[in-house]
């Protein structure tokens, strides 16, 4: 029987030694970001994504082994555990197989078969299964089992009871069910019908559809599930019943006997009454799990891209949270996100105070030197954008605007966290501030919102919420630790995603900072309540201190590697203070062969390469490689769009069937997966990510339905 280590190694294409090392590191309490960044020699350089996949498989396989142990114990206590059954259970690689093998030994509620057994009909059922009786009349052999006044008072009723026992035994046989499961997966189709064929719904494209289980796209599965849940669709998994019964007959009927007809009837009943409904439920569950797993993957990828967007540093921002009746909330922020001023203006109906709004905004531009206006994309966004664009057109001041996604802003502004951060501000002003800060530092602001609320996925509310939360939390942790965190300015929300730091410890760090002043040395973290040695090991390298006592504290070099880093600087002839002046761009050239130097210093080559890269450009932010934010000075109208028009836009969402792109009109346009590239694209994420700036061509405009079709492939002349 393969070990957990060898199973994972084979599945993920790793060596058993690598897997064993990672498991040991995880069991010692090391986090995935820490292992990925600071234990490359031990793991062979496995990245954080692969490490999380390994961790997930480890958790599943350990749960599987625990379930096997429970099942073996339960069957053994019944005195029914054979060597063959033990071997089959121990060899099982999925939970479903374990449950199939355990099914005959589970306690059952009263069934037709159990009632027949209680009536003493099992010996007759065994005769049917044995197929050894070649002469005689089945009814004559059944007659002695008949009991007057019972449910089995005739030979026919007795034979029915025997068939019920056989049918249940076949349905409980793991090997028969496995064979039929394979047939179902290969041949079954999912059929969809309307509950009311005359009703027009968003699901009418699925009315009367039929598609093989193995080929139906994941997004379609989720759409059909939602339609069924809303009472608009009827869904059925259909398998060729004749083929399934024939397969089961072939497996069960081995020789001629007087019970052949009874056995055939039991086989057909077993499949149609017991096995088929169970397999239909199972296949629907498998389809849903497959679709949800893929949707969670897409959601996680989109969330990672959104969190990794380039910050707009040095911008003084006027943030607008549009609305109609209650007006448009305005927050003015300095380049560090500090609130300078706030008010409410009414550029939209019913007041439509365009002149007053423009005077207020122009005053903020003059008074505070604001150079960017941020507009939320919610209700009233379009009208507000027109007012802002008109203001920009009539001013000589360098000023531009951009649209930001409001998703989750209301969740944050009404949260306990927001009320603790800004107790004197109302909910709406907090929301406007959040929009402005999303531009200045998307990561620092978006971590304050539950990642499920960010809204960059498909059917997120229909997904397994525990699995979604686990995946998204992992993504946020990966991005936060990849970027690094300023220990002296980070919020508790941001600190809580740092490797090794829990939410309570994050609050303790902030409290310590408020009581004792700014951190000047990473070692001060050891004085924070409940931040122990293991937590310090896991978090220290990801927390940066600008202007501290040791210049290395402002880098991603881990304190355990300070001796090696200091020696590298010495051999390069560089003082540590050079790190505060932008680093040492030519340090790699000064050092020569890094491999030889690593051996000389007694550190691993991967670790030394990371140290050298960090000394070249200390505190480098990987988000600087992301596309720049697209700013506008004028508004584009839906009616301006024409087929063939070339535009620049920003990817707002990526789903299984394509990507939605903001091209500066109220409605995002859709680039279908077939229009993403002039080659086959298996999934849109191969080509685009959320936040990407892309060139698109308009291929269609449906003004009645408000839909825009785009292509990233230029039409051939």
Short names for language-model regions:
Residues 548-549, 553-717:
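Single-stranded RNA-binding regions, centering on S1/OB-family and related RNA-binding modules
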Residues 38-40, 129, 240, 322, ...:
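Short, ordered loop/turn segments at secondary-structure junctions
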Residues 74, 88, 99-102, 227-242, ...:
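Structured, non-catalytic alpha/beta "coupling" segments that mediate domain-domain communication
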Residues 50-53, 60, 64-319, 323-424, ...:
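Duplex nucleic acid-engaging cores and interfaces of nucleic-acid transaction enzymes
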């Amino acid at each position: 029987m393969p070990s957990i280590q060898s199973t994972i190694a084979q599945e993920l294409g790793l060596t058993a030694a690598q897997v064993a090392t990672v498991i040991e590191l995880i069991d010692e309490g090391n986090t995935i970001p820490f292992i990925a960044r600071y234990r490359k020699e031990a793991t062979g350089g496995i990245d954080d994504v692969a490490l999380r996949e390994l961790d997930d498989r480890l958790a599943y396989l350990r749960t599987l082994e625990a379930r096997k142990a429970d099942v073996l114990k339960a069957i053994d206590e019944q005195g029914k555990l054979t060597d063959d059954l033990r071997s089959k259970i121990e060899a099982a690689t999925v939970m479903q197989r374990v449950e199939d093998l355990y099914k005959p030994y589970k306690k059952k509620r009263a069934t037709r078969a159990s009632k027949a057994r209680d009536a003493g009909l099992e010996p007759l059922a065994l005769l049917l299964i044995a197929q050894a009786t070649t002469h005689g009349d089945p009814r004559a052999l059944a007659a002695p089992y008949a009991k007057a006044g019972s449910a089995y008072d005739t030979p026919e009723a007795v034979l029915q009871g025997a068939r019920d026992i056989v049918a249940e035994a076949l349905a409980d046989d793991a090997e028969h069910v496995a064979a039929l499961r394979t047939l179902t997966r290969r041949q079954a189709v999912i059929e969809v019908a309307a509950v009311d064929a005359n009703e027009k719904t968003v699901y009418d494209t699925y009315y009367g559809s039929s598609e093989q289980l193995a080929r139906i796209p994941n997004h379609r599965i989720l759409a059909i599930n939602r339609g069924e849940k809303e009472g608009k669709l009827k869904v059925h998994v259909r398998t060729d019943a004749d083929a399934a019964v024939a397969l089961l007959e072939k497996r069960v009927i081995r020789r001629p006997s007087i019970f052949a007809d009874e056995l055939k009837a039991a086989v057909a009943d077993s499949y149609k009454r017991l096995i088929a409904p169970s397999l239909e439920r199972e296949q629907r569950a498998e389809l849903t799990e497959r679709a949800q797993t893929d949707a969670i993957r897409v959601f996680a990828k989109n969330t990672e891209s959104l969190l990794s967007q380039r910050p707009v540093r040095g911008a003084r921002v006027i943030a607008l949270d549009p609305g109609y009746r209650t007006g448009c909330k305005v927050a003015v922020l300095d380049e560090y996100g500090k609130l300078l001023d706030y008010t409410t203006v009414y550029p939209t109906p019913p007041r439509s105070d365009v002149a007053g709004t423009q005077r207020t905004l122009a005053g903020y531009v003059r008074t505070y030197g604001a150079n960017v206006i941020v507009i939320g994309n919610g209700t009233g966004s379009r009208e507000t954008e027109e007012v802002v664009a008109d203001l920009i057109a009539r001013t000589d001041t360098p000023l531009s605007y951009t649209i930001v996604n409001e998703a989750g802003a209301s969740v944050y502004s009404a949260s306990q966290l927001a009320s603790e951060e800004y107790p004197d501000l109302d909910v709406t002003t907090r929301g406007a501030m959040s929009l402005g800060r999303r531009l200045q530092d998307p990561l620092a602001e978006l971590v304050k919102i539950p990642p499920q609320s960010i809204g960059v996925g498909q059917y997120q509310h229909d997904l397994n919420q525990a699995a979604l939360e686990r995946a998204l939390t992992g993504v946020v942790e990966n991005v936060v630790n990849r970027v690094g965190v300023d220990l002296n300015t980070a919020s508790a929300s941001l600190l809580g995603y740092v490797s090794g730091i829990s939410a309570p410890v994050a609050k303790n760090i902030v409290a310590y900072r408020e009581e004792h002043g700014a951190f000047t040395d990473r070692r001060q973290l050891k004085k924070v309540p409940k931040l122990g040695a293991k937590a310090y090991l896991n978090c220290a390298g990801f927390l940066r201190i600008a202007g501290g006592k040791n210049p290395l504290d402002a880098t991603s070099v881990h304190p355990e590697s300070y001796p090696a880093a200091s020696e590298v600087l010495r051999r390069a002839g560089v003082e540590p203070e050079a790190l505060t002046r932008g680093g040492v761009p030519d340090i790699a050239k000064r050092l020569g062969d890094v491999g030889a130097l690593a051996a000389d210093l007694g550190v691993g080559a991967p670790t030394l390469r990371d140290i050298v890269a960090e000394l070249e450009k200390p505190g480098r932010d990987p988000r600087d490689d992301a596309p720049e934010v697209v700013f506008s000075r004028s508004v584009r109208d839906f009616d301006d769009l024409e087929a063939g028009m070339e535009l620049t836009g920003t990817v707002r969402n990526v789903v299984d069937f394509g990507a939605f792109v903001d091209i500066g009109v109220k409605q995002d346009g859709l680039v279908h997966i077939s229009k993403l590239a002039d080659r086959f694209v298996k999934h849109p994420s191969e080509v685009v990510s959320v936040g990407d700036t892309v060139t698109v061509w308009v291929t269609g405009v449906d003004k009645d339905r408000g839909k825009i079709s785009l292509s990233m492939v230029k039409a051939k002349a």
